[in-house]
Amino acid sequence: MCEIEPENLAKLIAPSGFYNIKSVRIKSFCEAIAAKFGDFESFCELVKRPWLRKIKGVGDETCDSILCYACGQEVMVADSYSARILGAFGYEFESYDELSEWLSELDFKRVFSVCGADDVNTAYCAFHGLIDEFCKAHFKGGKFDEKALRLFENLR
């Protein structure tokens, strides 16, 4: 990735939007990983949140997504979908960190059994993935559809 020209990378990531800016940032990010950690395996093993947050373009959710999904660390990704679902039950959070901490403190025993997870990272990935898939299917135009609202009502 460090060797690819930003223009070529931009073509590969074009469907993600803002691809010209993202291609430069991704290339810079890969170069920073190579300079600091040498290789991807070392990066995954040694990287910490503060280092990632210093990278231009890496916000809280992106940082935690990298730690959870790419590095396999025990980090629960909190996102706007999570906040929306919890908001439907009356929960409000003042910051990303507050939401992330709340989600991390949930009892994941049920998630472990449902998804067959044998470690915390797998459970976090599965739980976050289920939240995203649910909201992609049932959150449109800034609101939940009737099916989601009925489900929420049954869960109260």
Task: Place the predicted regions along the sequence by residue.
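Catalytic cores of DNA base-excision repair glycosylases
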Residues: 2-156
